[in-house]
Amino acid sequence: MNTRVGTIGNASLLTADAHPMIDPFGRAVTYLRVSVTDRCDFRCTYCMAENMTFLPKKDLLTLEELDRLCSAFVAKGVKKIRLTGGEPLVRKNIMYLVRRLGEKIGAGLDEVTLTTNGSQLSRHAEELYDCGVRRINVSLDTLDPDKFRKITRWGDFAKVMEGIDAAQKAGIKIKLNAVALKDFNDAEMPEIMRFAHGRGMDLTVIETMPMGEIDEDRTDQYLPLSKLRADLEKQFTLTDIDYQTGGPARYVRVAETGGRLGFITPMTHNFCESCNRVRLTCTGTLYMCLGQNDAADLRAALRATEDDALLHAAIDEAITRKPKGHDFIIDRTHNRPAVARHMSVTGG
C-alpha cells in the first residue's frame, strides 16, 4: 500500500488508510469520542445532579491540545470523531476545533460529527456545515414543552426546535436521540417517532445508564427497550434491517412512517462485541470503555514534549487495556451507579 504522510498540527496524518489500532479482542478502534467540556446549559435529571460541581477551567486541555490529540488518533487509524460534552457548543471558541478537525477530512479522517442538546444550534449550524459537519445527533426526550423543562430542569424547548430548523436548513442531517424513561416518555414515543420521521430524521431510543450520582432513582427511571419495542409493535410494523452508522444502535424500518428507528440497549443487550471506540475527556483522560473506570492519562504525554512519539506510545499502551465489555447493572439494593463518574464527564 502506498501512503503519503502529511502534517496537521504536531501529528503526522496518513493520506491513505493508516493501520487501525487493534484491541486485545481483535476489534479495530476507528472511532474517537471527544468530550470537549463537562459543562452543559441543561441539567437533565438522568444525566446530572442539579447542583453539579464542574471541573476548574484551568484543568481543561486547550483547544489546540485537543486538536493535537485528535491528530494523533487519526494518524493511528481513527476514521470518525464525534464531539460531545456536557454540551459541546457551550465550549468557548469551539468552532476553532471543529474547523481544524474538518481540515482532516480526506487526510485520514472520514467524518466529524457531534452530539448536542440543540440549544446552541441556531447560532452555529451554518458554520458547522462550512467546517465539514454533515450529520449530528440531537438529544430530545419529549415534545411537550412543560415536560421538557422538567427533564432538563430549565431548558427552552422552543430554542431547541429553532436549532433543529437551522441545522436542517443548513443541510445537516439530524438523528434524534431519546432516552427511554419509564412513566415519563414511554407513552410519547409514537409521537416522537412520527415527528422525527416526518422531518426525515432517524430516531434512536436509548436505555438509561447507571453513571454518576443523580437526584433521581434510576430503578424508577429504567425502561427495558424490549418492552418499549413490544408496545410499539402493537401500533407499528417494525422490520429489522441491516443498517449501520458506526455506532451501537440496532435499526428497524417502520412501515407506517417509512423511517428508521434505532435501539441502543447497554443494559438488556450490550453492544460490546463490536465496540470500535474510545473516549477522550477534556482533561486528556482516555477511557477505553464507557462502563469501566480504567483510564489512561494522555495529558502528561502530550505536555512532556512537542514530539508525538511519547503520545503515540501512551495511546498504544492504553489500547492494550481495552476490556471485553462493560459492567453496567442497575443496583436496586443500594441505588448506586455502576460507574461513579457522570456521563457529562465521559461524553456518552
From Swiss-Prot:
Entry note: cofactor:
Binds 2 [4Fe-4S] clusters. Binds 1 [4Fe-4S] cluster coordinated with 3 cysteines and an exchangeable S-adenosyl-L-methionine and 1 [4Fe-4S] cluster coordinated with 3 cysteines and the GTP-derived substrate.
Which Pfam families has this protein been placed in? Fer4_12, Mob_synth_C, Radical_SAM
- Which CDD domains does the record associate with it? Radical_SAM, Twitch_MoaA
Taking every annotated instance into account, which residue ranges of this chain make up the domain Radical SAM core? 24-242
The source's superkingdom equals Bacteria
InterPro entries recorded: Aldolase_TIM, Elp3/MiaA/NifB-like_rSAM, MoaA, MoaA_NifB_PqqE_Fe-S-bd_CS, MoaA_twitch, MoCo_biosynth_MoaA/MoaC, rSAM
Gene Ontology terms describing biological process: Mo-molybdopterin cofactor biosynthetic process
Q: Which PROSITE patterns match?
A: MOAA_NIFB_PQQE, RADICAL_SAM
Quickly give the catalysed reaction. GTP + AH2 + S-adenosyl-L-methionine = (8S)-3',8-cyclo-7,8-dihydroguanosine 5'-triphosphate + 5'-deoxyadenosine + L-methionine + A + H(+)
Residues engaged in binding GTP:
33, 82, 115, 175, 277-279
Q: Where does S-adenosyl-L-methionine bind?
A: 46, 86, 139, 209
- One MF term in the entry's GO annotations: 4 iron, 4 sulfur cluster binding
- Keyword Electron transport among record annotations: no
Q: Which cofactor does it need?
A: [4Fe-4S] cluster
Annotated positions binding [4Fe-4S] cluster 2: 272, 275, 289
The cross-references to NCBIfam families, in alphabetical order and at most eight, read:
moaA
**Subunit annotation:** Monomer and homodimer.
* Role this protein plays: Catalyzes the cyclization of GTP to (8S)-3',8-cyclo-7,8-dihydroguanosine 5'-triphosphate.
Give the UniProt family note: Belongs to the radical SAM superfamily. MoaA family.
Please report the name of this protein according to its UniProt entry. GTP 3',8-cyclase
Q: Tell me the organism.
A: Rhizobium leguminosarum bv. trifolii (strain WSM2304)
